[in-house]
């Protein structure tokens, strides 16, 4: 087996010398490329594109983070994930009473991750929501070119859906060089 690097489709268009969007591709004994693993595809920096929440009991969708959320998730080759997402139209708190509202448009944690099948599983070590610390959480992910679509399991989120079961549908775009 050999190890080569291959860029995702369209990832290096116009940036032939870039290595920001490459992931390892192993070759079989006959020299044919094998598909990259999900972990190979995840490693790197991803920008938040959209964050929608589906309520289980009603089937309605909430644009929980607003029309133009921002944030990043970073996966390292050695198994760390850092996740920081913010909703649209956030402004600095002017009073103590403003802080709880800001927490409703924030998701942030750091931990170790591993990949099993089509899921990444993280052991949360620090988080914006203390009840997440020490938990193991699963996310289903589909990577297509430079886009990653993530679906959470049904659960009760601390910051929306008023304690009802919901799941998040999150889209990321692989970050460009220097982004």
Label each region the model flagged.
Residues 23-110, 115-179:
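Lipid interaction determinants
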Residues 1-29:
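N-terminal amphipathic/basic-hydrophobic helices that include classical n-h-c signal peptides
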